[in-house]
Amino acid sequence: SRLQKLLNCPAKQIVFTPTATIALNIIIQGLLQGERKTVYITPFEHNAVTRTLHHFELLGKVAVLQLNVDGHLRYDIDEIRQQFSKNKPDVLIMSHASNVFGLVAPVEELSVLAKQQGATVVIDMAQTAGLIPCNTGLETIDFAVFAGHKTLYGPTGISGFAMKPTANLH
């Protein structure tokens, strides 16, 4: 489909939702079933991610840890590698670009580090899908969320996510 080409993920399935918030909630709730999980997020996540994770934190189902950035808002890859060694990630959720600071995450590099630890990787591209290229077709990315009404220039009410066919949501 054209959307798969635009997101550079021809082998992934597309699931449509009314909003990116709903897409993120479906993914997060589906991934956090079962035993307690360790979830890493960036310091720049949207409330759609942080509020949902906070709810699961209160239930004792998740430990939420933040990826380290330095004083210049750059991701410290060596420090993140150490973080992952100390506390193995089950899930990594990261905004492709912050809706506040505009900081673009090194998605490819961070997803490889997370996958080396066996984590499921979720990329929130609500601000960037169709605007800033991201190779969401990589095997290291399990889910990529998009908002149709933002930089895809579609109508309101068309959002969703691309997912690997082997991705497992409960």
Please state what every model-predicted region is.
Residues 1-170:
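Pyridoxal 5′-phosphate
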